[in-house]
């Protein structure tokens, strides 16, 4: 059975991710404590189900400590992947402000009977408390930062991640702009800001690293080709180590100043090379479609 566990910070898009799994034919359960996941898996396996999606988060905080052991036990018999959704505190505060929903940790105090007593924990404090409590889970999961991501874009990303379950590891190349921040979900980060910048050519400025004139410009620069080759060699050298570690995903982030030209070109070039090695995805954060 393929089991995908969705966890992460409240307000970061877990419901969206679980809905994508459900639309893809997964048997989905929201807010299931970790200790019940093995029992549910055994039952569904006996019934002939092949795909299970489970969301578990701070609402089941008493059992979260059991999740790593649960994942290891399930992985002995099933294909298990953990996706951890996160977002910046500013983005989360904005979302809570728009929806007017209460954060789980601001709604009650630990150990309160009858559903808990309301307290005065500020929203930002609740978010940071949750981030601290969940940090051990994030370390062992595939992280997705949804801070600047629209709902439709997140849906597309999740669809891509679950599209092909025949590969042991999905390799994701992500371009980004340093002026918008480094992706928190990256496993490797490469800085290509020292390369010649098409931005300073007025004819190339409105284009992207996927457009032929920009590609021709960058491919004509020996420095660009040399750096792309060095990054390729590094990733290829260490990729077997990540596969041996039973990783489901590896995110390689390529950053330039604005995330429009150089990083996009390098990410596309690397993806084209590594597609021969298995399941490869490309994400251009700053070129994400509207909607």
Swiss-Prot record:
Family that this chain belongs to: Belongs to the RapZ-like family.
One Pfam family hit: RapZ-like_N
Keywords assigned: ATP-binding, GTP-binding, Nucleotide-binding
GO-annotated molecular function: ATP binding; GTP binding
Residues bound to GTP: 57-60
General function of this protein: Displays ATPase and GTPase activities.
Xref: InterPro entries: P-loop_NTPase (IPR027417), RapZ-like (IPR005337), RapZ-like_N (IPR053930), RapZ_C (IPR053931)
Membrane-spanning ranges: none
UniProt-annotated binding residues for ATP: 8-15
Name the UniProt record assigns to this protein: Nucleotide-binding protein RALTA_A0325
This protein's record includes keyword Chloroplast: no
């Amino acid at each position: 059975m393929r089991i995908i566990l969705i966890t992460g910070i409240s307000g970061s898009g877990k419901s969206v991710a679980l809905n994508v799994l459900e639309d893809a034919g997964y048997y989905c359960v929201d807010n299931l404590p970790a200790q019940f996941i093995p029992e549910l898996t055994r039952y569904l396996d006996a019934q002939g189900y092949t795909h299970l999606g489970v969301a578990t988060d701070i609402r089941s905080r008493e059992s979260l400590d059991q999740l790593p052991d649960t994942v290891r036990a399930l992985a002995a018999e099933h294909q298990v992947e953990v996706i951890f959704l996160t977002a910046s505190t500013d983005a989360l505060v904005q979302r809570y402000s728009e929806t007017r929903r209460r954060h789980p940790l601001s709604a009650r105090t630990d150990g309160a009977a009858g559903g808990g007593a309301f307290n005065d924990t500020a929203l930002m404090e609740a978010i940071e408390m949750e981030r601290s409590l969940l940090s051990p889970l994030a370390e062992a999961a595939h992280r997705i930062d949804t801070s600047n991501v629209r709902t439709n874009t997140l849906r597309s990303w999740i669809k891509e991640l679950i599209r092909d379950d025949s590969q042991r590891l999905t390799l994701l190349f992500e371009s980004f702009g340093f002026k918008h921040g480094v992706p928190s979900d990256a496993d490797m980060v490469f800085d290509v800001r020292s390369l010649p910048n098409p931005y300073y050519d007025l004819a190339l400025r409105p284009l992207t690293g996927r457009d032929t004139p920009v590609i021709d410009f960058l491919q004509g620069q020996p420095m660009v080709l040399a750096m792309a080759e060095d990054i390729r060699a590094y990733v290829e050298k260490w990729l077997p180590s990540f596969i041996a570690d039973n990783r489901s995903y590896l995110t390689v982030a390529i950053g330039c100043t604005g995330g429009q030209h150089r990083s996009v070109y390098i990410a596309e070039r690397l993806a084209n090379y590594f597609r021969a090695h298995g399941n490869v995805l490309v994400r251009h954060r700053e070129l994400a479609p509207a909607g």
